[in-house]
Amino acid sequence: MAIRKYKPTTPGRRGSSVSDFAEITRDHPEKSLIRPLHGKGGRNAHGRITTRHKGGGHKRAYRVIDFRRHDKDGVDAKVAHIEYDPNRTANIALLHYLDGEKRYIIAPQGLKQGAIVESGANADIKPGNNLPLRNIPAGTLIHAVELRPGGGAKMARSAGASIQLLGKEGTYASLRMPSGEIRRVDVRCRATVGEVGNAEQANINWGKAGRMRWKGKRPTVRGVVMNPVDHPHGGGEGKTSGGRHPVSPWGKPEGRTRKPNKASDKLIVRRRRTGKNKR
């Protein structure tokens, strides 16, 4: 993937860029693998906003991605197409299995149209192949990793993401996450070899607010420019700094959003670096 920059013909075009979509080989999805997707606008079943800054955006269809490939062990598949997916930053690959079934997977870096991929304990160590962690050599970069055996891929699924397999000891494998965190995972968990493709997506300059609205993202208004009735940082004469440590609109201090008693935390060997320790 390469980034194509626009000429500054308008204020919105100045500095903006877009993917050249050179890797994409088809401009429409497989009909049997799409589902209707109804936007919720950040609302819950009661109609109340539970997630701010969501709403609008272009109409989309959901592409059904295969995050559990264990039922296709020993069945080779040919990469028929590399496609765009509006629901994620990564591209997706359409696989045609030898038994006639078609499925989507996240497209790893370097996977080309016409390549053959496989899954199972005896699969080769090459991009796109899916196998248990116990069968992957230490030092390999992987993505689409399960947290629990058979639970489906949960980690490292966005564009450019990868996890490094550091080593294996007993029934656990040590993984270095994209955040720098080191975590232990059951060696029976599956992963796909390689890094997620479309890494240059992070360098796209969206250029104008309207392009973010096309994506379904609404404006994020700072608390210090609100009135006191709307935010703890609001009000004051002229420009102010808020007068207190940063908080949410409901008065909760910013940061520390991780659940403190999550069951899987006992498998974290080293925490990610945050704040002052991020060096």
Swiss-Prot record:
Disulfide bonds: none annotated. InterPro entries: NA-bd_OB-fold, Rib_uL2_dom2, Ribosomal_uL2, Ribosomal_uL2_bac/org-type, Ribosomal_uL2_C, Ribosomal_uL2_CS, Ribosomal_uL2_dom3, Ribosomal_uL2_RNA-bd_dom. It comes from the Bacteria. GO terms for molecular function: rRNA binding; structural constituent of ribosome; transferase activity. One of its GO terms (biological process) is cytoplasmic translation. GO terms for cellular component: large ribosomal subunit. Residues 33-58, 223-279 are annotated as: Disordered. It holds the Pfam family Ribosomal_L2_C. Residues 253-268 have a biased composition (Basic and acidic residues). Residues 37-58, 269-279 have a biased composition (Basic residues). Keywords: Ribonucleoprotein, Ribosomal protein, RNA-binding, rRNA-binding. Belongs to the universal ribosomal protein uL2 family. One of the primary rRNA binding proteins. Required for association of the 30S and 50S subunits to form the 70S ribosome, for tRNA binding and peptide bond formation. It has been suggested to have peptidyltransferase activity; this is somewhat controversial. Makes several contacts with the 16S rRNA in the 70S ribosome. Part of the 50S ribosomal subunit. Forms a bridge to the 30S subunit in the 70S ribosome. This is Large ribosomal subunit protein uL2. It comes from Mycolicibacterium gilvum (strain PYR-GCK) (Mycobacterium gilvum (strain PYR-GCK)). The gene is rplB.
